[in-house]
Amino acid sequence: MQSRMQGQRTLQLRQNSCIQPKWISQKNFTFGAATSAYQVEGAAHRALNGWDYFTHRYPERVSDRSIGDLACNSYDLYKDDVKLLKRMNVQAYRFSIAWSRVLPKGRLIGGVDENGITYYNNLINELKANGIEPFVTIFHWDVPQDFRRRIWRLLKPTYSDFKNYAELLFQRFGDRVKFWITLNQPYSLAVKGYGDGQYPPGRCTDCEFGGDSGTEPYIVGHHELLAHMEAVSLYRKRYQKFQGGKIGTTLIGRWFIPLNETNDLDKAAAKREFDFSVLGSTGVRTISKDNERLGDRLPKFTPKQSALLKGSLDFLGLNYYVTRYATYRPPPMPTQHSVLTDSGVTIGFERNGVSIGVKASINFDVKDLRHLVDFFLFVELLLLSTRIPSDSKSHQKQELLMLIANALADNGRIQFQCSHLSCLKCAIEDGCNVAGYFAWSLMDNYEFGNGYTLRFDMNWVNFTNPADRREKASGKWFSRFIAK
């Protein structure tokens, strides 16, 4: 049996190691690109969601005070999106359904917006006509605003409403959609929305909207997992057999290295932070002391719920962004409990003044992607989002002062992609069950709290005229790589 930490052999990260004609021999490996509804569609012809309210009412929560009302205008330009995908030679497109576009009130009782259904039918049909497989995320953080008010910001159970919403999608699109992702990064919504207040609804212990950073993130995360479980159970009972699809979820994928690799406290801290921020999103706690650490603040699953949750993945998606150093930090006083400090770990990007990896909008050490993949050795994995570092931050006003040619010549992204694909090649050759690689993102888009200041993507977009889209060097390289 292979060890989940077996990847000790030297990784060859030369650029030419990932451009060979036959990159892997594994059958049914999928290359794709990804987006999400709020980040690309625009707000036209749908009801408000929590991000609409949040960015309009509190623009200071976004780094450039921008809003996602237009974004890439994919609602009107979806055929252009598909043309980009076709030009890139990808076999799949991961996108999300905007909950408020199909259920304006968030609930079936509030009525179905057939125009929204038509939009997604058109998108799915266009993808299929071009030989591109749709991978659909059911929920990517955009709770309908009317629904959010009624359920008190996800702090009350919403399983039946989410299940009904998911069933609507299974009914209307399941004849063509064969890959369903219930939730995108449940950890992020729970922590950013209820731990530090940076995402809607902006709740935390010290936030003006109120909240409790020591309890609410765990309640929300618990409800997210139960909603996932209910949707999976429904799909398997009523739809999977005759529709022939698969269903899973997506976690934020991070790896942690002890700041001092000879210090036992730092070693334990790295393991514990992984447990909190990655495994915690699956309902799994591998260190019993963590349950003791959280006590009654951690909601409990019934034995039946635990059993259903344990078997609720046909595949697991990982969004890999970052590697960080971890060092021991004493736990907070009982009166200062917070999801941000409960793990008793301080994380950072530098050791003795040296960055852990490439300095960009994110920091990464590419070899640690291999460790992350190894950890989930016996699960079918889809690497659903690898954020390609932005060469620079560029506010849309500043773009008038820069040459578009510089933005398009993103050679750093090419090396980033190449290094990650080299690691995946090693992992697959050693038996890791990695079934796909999806680059984030198809095109420059609205990056939630960062607004339009970051460009992670393989196609340049003019945010004042989203029909103006231009292929970057990384997009051309990715296209050639897939075609070989």
Curated annotation (Swiss-Prot):
GO terms for biological process: carbohydrate metabolic process. The keyword Glycoprotein applies. One of its GO terms (cellular component) is mitochondrion. Its EC number is 3.2.1.147. GO terms for molecular function: beta-glucosidase activity; thioglucosidase activity. InterPro entries: Glyco_hydro_1, Glyco_hydro_1_N_CS, Glycoside_hydrolase_SF. It holds the Pfam family Glyco_hydro_1. PROSITE patterns: GLYCOSYL_HYDROL_F1_2. This is Putative myrosinase 6. It comes from Arabidopsis thaliana.
